[in-house]
């Protein structure tokens, strides 16, 4: 996305472009080439910001998951080049489709949204006792940052949503490490939900992930027929064999 503080149809002198990529991390050389291209076209390189969502379910972009014993990197050179090309393409597409908008920001604590997102150690009902606002700091010292920051851009004339941006500190690793499926993890699911609800485009920027703020094993509660949040107490087989699947759910505390 691109944000410019200039009036519409004027020369852009105050602007920045921000690209976020659904991968575990990126080295600077992935976008230095893009910066050089933009400099050649008269744009300031320091106005380009590139971040990674730290997604653990994407192809390896750092070399973390190869075969270190045999000195084999997990990175695919062809895929890495594709990322560089995609960063440039994303900026150009955003620049070609800029719209006058009004920005609004909001922040909340995830722990304040529901006691079912927080474990018993913090006064909630989540089955993971250490959970706080859908997060668990799995290393000492245990410090949880459960703040959710959002920014939304709405069209200045129609009010329609152009962009919804989220900023939260949960590691995108809820898919675990025992599969070869490629996805954007919870970031991808969140993006789909936000775009279906608000319209426009949804983008996620990671907060202070640290060492570490983990969303792993943070099951979401289900919603029963009465609209109450509950966690299931039985297996998928139990549910499929039951005449009333809601019998498998815990009563509201």
Whereabouts are the PLM-identified features?
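Conserved beta-alpha junction segments in alpha/beta enzyme cores
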Residues: 1-253
């Amino acid at each position: 996305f691109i944000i410019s503080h200039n009036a519409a149809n004027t020369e852009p002198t105050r602007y920045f472009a921000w690209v976020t990529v659904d991968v575990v991390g990126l080295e600077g050389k992935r976008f230095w080439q893009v910066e050089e291209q933009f400099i050649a076209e008269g744009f300031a390189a320091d106005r380009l910001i590139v971040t990674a969502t730290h997604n653990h379910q994407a192809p390896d972009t750092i070399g973390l998951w190869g075969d270190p014993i045999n000195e084999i990197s997990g990175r695919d050179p062809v895929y890495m080049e594709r990322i560089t090309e995609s960063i440039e393409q994303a900026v150009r597409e955003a620049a070609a489709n800029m719209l006058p908008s009004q920005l609004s920001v909001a922040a909340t604590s995830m722990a304040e949204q529901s006691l079912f997102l927080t474990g018993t150690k913090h006064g909630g009902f989540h089955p993971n006792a250490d959970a706080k606002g859908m997060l668990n700091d799995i290393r000492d010292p245990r410090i949880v940052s459960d703040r959710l920051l959002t920014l939304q851009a709405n069209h200045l004339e129609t009010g329609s949503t152009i962009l919804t941006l989220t900023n939260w500190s949960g590691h995108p690793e809820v898919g675990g490490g025992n599969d070869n499926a490629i996805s954007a993890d919870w970031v991808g699911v969140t993006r789909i939900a936000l775009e279906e609800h608000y319209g426009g485009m949804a983008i996620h920027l990671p907060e202070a992930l640290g060492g570490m703020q983990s969303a792993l094993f943070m099951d979401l509660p289900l919603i029963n027929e009465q609209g109450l949040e509950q966690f299931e107490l039985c297996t998928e087989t139990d549910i499929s064999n039951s005449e009333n699947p809601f019998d498998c759910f815990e009563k509201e505390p």
